[in-house]
Amino acid sequence: MNPTETKFNQDMRNIYVTAKEDLGYTASRFMQLVSQKGGLQAARQLILKEGGTYGFEVLWENKRLDLSVEALVLQPEYESLFSDEERMLCRNRLEEFGYF
């Protein structure tokens, strides 16, 4: 794992911690997926999921899409980890839900 992937993996774990602390939302399946597949593969699986995820819905309802995997994927420091198509999916989903 290169340094960028390592940092991304840690930031994925931080999503779980922050959502739990700030919202009282325990995203057990999310953390299980990150632990099993690593942050990068977990993110790819989640962003490609048709119809989005329950966790995204919880974050949207609480006006915290800044904690979404989609928002993390779009951070400039992680551009090299994802394809243009993956990043476009994230941007489109966030735009659809009023993040931008």
Task: Briefly describe each language-model feature range.
Residues 1-22, 96:
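Charged, compositionally biased N-terminal leader segments and the immediate start
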Residues 6, 10, 28, 40-41, ...:
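Generic alpha-helical secondary structure signal
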Residues 11-13, 25, 51-54, 67, ...:
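Accessory DNA-engaging acidic/polar modules
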Residues 1, 9, 23, 49, ...:
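Short linear sequence motifs
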